[in-house]
């Protein structure tokens, strides 16, 4: 039986989490969507890359829609530039990461379906990154957090 959430409101989650320099604003989480989707707004500052490790996940897809600026997504080794009005679906199992190589901030609307990941993951990752105080974050702690939330860290690139 599907539980119907009777508290219908705009941006029911409305929580912003800072992970390094990247800002993640949750608009809807699995708690508000009965697990069907999480929707978040991702803001990547100019010249920045997301501090989490490239990864994959088998439990959900990520669908991205460009709102502002251009973000660069590397999906299974292929670099894809996502701009305003463009959509990109990252399938389950695809190794991916992202950056903003541009001169202006980039913003995407991201849907995770089903909602297998939420604010808790990003809060924990932010704590590890903040603890590094500008230095490299503890990779083993990051990998452990990722594992607990169903993400598989990609091996580091060969030099």
What is the role of each PLM region?
Residues 123-159:
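Acidic/histidine-enriched, glycine/proline-rich intrinsically disordered or flexible terminal extensions
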Residues 72, 92-119:
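Ligand-binding loop in jelly-roll beta-barrel domains
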Residues 8-10, 17, 77-95:
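Short acidic-glycine-tyrosine-enriched beta hairpin
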Residues 23, 63, 70-72, 79, ...:
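Structural motif
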Residues 2-5, 111, 115-134:
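A hydrophobic/aromatic-rich effector-binding and dimerization subdomain
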Residues 1-14, 152, 157-159:
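Basic/polar N-terminal segments that are highly enriched at the extreme N-terminus
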Residues 41-45, 56-74, 111-113:
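Short, conserved beta-strand element in jelly-roll/cupin
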Residues 15-54, 60-61:
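A short glycine-rich, His/Asp/Glu-containing loop-to-beta-strand
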């Amino acid at each position: 039986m599907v539980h119907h959430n009777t508290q219908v409101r705009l941006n029911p989650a409305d929580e912003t989490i800072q992970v390094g320099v990247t800002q993640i604003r949750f608009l809807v989480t699995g708690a508000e969507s009965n697990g069907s989707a999480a929707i978040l707004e991702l803001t990547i500052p100019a010249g920045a890359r997301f501090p989490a490790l490239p990864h994959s996940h088998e439990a959900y897809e990520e669908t991205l829609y460009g709102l502002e600026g251009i973000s660069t997504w590397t999906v299974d080794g292929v670099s894809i530039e996502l701009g305003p009005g463009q959509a990109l679906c990252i399938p389950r199992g695809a190794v991916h990461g992202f950056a903003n190589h541009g001169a202006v901030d980039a913003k995407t609307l991201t849907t995770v379906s089903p909602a297998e990941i939420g604010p808790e993951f990003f809060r924990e990752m932010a704590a590890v990154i903040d603890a590094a105080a500008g230095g490299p974050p503890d990779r083993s702690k990051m990998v452990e957090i990722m594992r607990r939330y169903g993400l598989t860290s990609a091996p580091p690139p060969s030099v």
